[in-house]
Amino acid sequence: MKTRIITAIVGILVLIGVMFTFNTMVFNLVIAAITLIAIHEIYSALGFEKKDWLMYAVLVPYTLLGMLSSYSAMRKLVMPMSFVLVTFFAIYLVVRNGTISYQKASGLLVFSGIVIFCFYSFVLLKERLPVEKFGYDAVFFILLILCFAWGGDTCAYFAGRAFGKHKLCPVVSPKKTVEGAIGGVLGTMVFGVVATLIYSIAANRMEAFTRSNIGVSMYVIIALLGCIAAVLGIYGDLFASVVKRQCGIKDYGTIFPGHGGILDRFDSVMFIAPFVTMVITAVFYA
């Protein structure tokens, strides 16, 4: 427990440091590095051999290009980049002549795609909500996404310990309970509304958040987002657990002592980040 607490404190300090670089290319580079580490964890979990390093290496330029390019450039590049990537995987399977399984290659491609979309969401928020025009709204929403994920996990943990009686998904995650999940949903909604209220007051955004361009208060939308995000966070956690069980591993990595790897810490963020980003950018900042 002591190791977990120390790691969490260090992680929070690092997160604060990274957010100070938000308006620079350093932020994009950090996100790209985190993404590549996560993809490498997938590569290792699926049991690829060293001679299959190309399977991972080909994802490096794809990831870097995505994280370091502007949104307008990405819109033009995503189709040709995806075509080249999928074609490479198909050719590689043929060249290896059946010595590498289609299931493993597909798993790497799909799981990596989920991870890339997850972390690209942070870059997209930066691009679509520039500091010069919207202040630090993008920083707030990135932190809100993490708050949805990790705050929901915390609420679910304590609610489960206090009231948990009915197993949620015993085969995949024996410790998760229905009561814990409900506590996580309610806690996430409260976390979201309180965090939004604090930010809107501190950043003098009360009027903008109260009277959104769709006629619905941002606080109402955040509460609804929190509810859906909590469910997506639980699903992301279960999805990552299923993969770990099928791969026969306990953790995806050891980069966070006491917590595991990047994917062990960001599993609940995987589906929350793209969802919240799409809603926020499409509804409030269209």
Label every model-predicted segment:
Residues R245-S268:
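Interfacial loop-to-transmembrane junctions
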Residues I198, A202, M278-A286:
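Juxtamembrane boundary at the C-terminal end of a transmembrane helix
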Residues I228-G233, F256:
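Transmembrane alpha-helix interface/packing and boundary motifs in multi-pass membrane proteins
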Residues M1-C227:
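Membrane-embedded alpha-helical bundles of polytopic integral membrane proteins
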Residues R265-A282:
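Final/C-terminal transmembrane alpha-helix of multipass membrane proteins
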